[in-house]
């Protein structure tokens, strides 16, 4: 068995090869700790594999923009990444930043991108493919900042790690 142990102050995470969570939410206002934890999770999942083929990163704020506003990413790109097999490798990690922006829109909001993003992420969380791992990150400091149904599903089958300098 291979073990990776992260130790920083009072926080310890132990990950074994048999216990690689498909879904990870890493959040908090301690950006360095969030980034170090995410980097170590990615390194563990993609050990010996080329990152350029096996790692994709999306930003929720970019995904929520209309097509004319953003030439970078759109929700269809995320859906395609989710639905296609990894290329030239046996596994893929998809990182989605600003996870606090993924919320179910109110019925009269009229924001189609918000609805599409929520449905796509809900689909990912409810049925992650065998050869893919998903890491969600956020600078939010409270669990209430996230969509309740999404965070509940991550709690049931994934890893949630919070790094904050203070408690409210």
What kind of feature is each model-predicted range?
Residues 4-6:
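Short hydrophobic targeting helices and cationic amphipathic motifs
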Residues 16-24, 32-168:
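Non-catalytic interfacial helical region
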Residues 27:
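Residues at the beta-strand->loop junction immediately N-terminal to the Walker
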């Amino acid at each position: 068995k291979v073990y990776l142990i992260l130790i920083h102050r009072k926080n310890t995470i132990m990950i074994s090869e048999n216990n690689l969570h498909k879904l990870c939410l890493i959040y908090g206002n301690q950006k360095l700790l969030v980034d170090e934890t995410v980097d170590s999770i990615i390194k563990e999942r993609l050990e010996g594999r080329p990152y350029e083929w096996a790692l994709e990163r999306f930003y929720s704020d970019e995904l929520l923009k209309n097509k004319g506003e953003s030439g970078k990413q759109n929700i269809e790109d995320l859906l395609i990444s989710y639905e296609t097999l990894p290329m030239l490798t046996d596994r893929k990690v998809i990182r989605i930043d600003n996870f606090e922006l993924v919320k179910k829109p109110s019925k009269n909001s009229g924001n189609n991108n918000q609805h599409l993003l929520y449905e796509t992420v809900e689909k990912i969380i409810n049925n992650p493919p065998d050869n893919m791992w998903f890491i969600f990150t956020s600078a939010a400091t409270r669990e209430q900042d996230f969509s309740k149904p999404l965070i509940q599903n991550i709690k049931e089958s994934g890893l949630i790690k919070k790094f904050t300098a203070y408690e409210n």
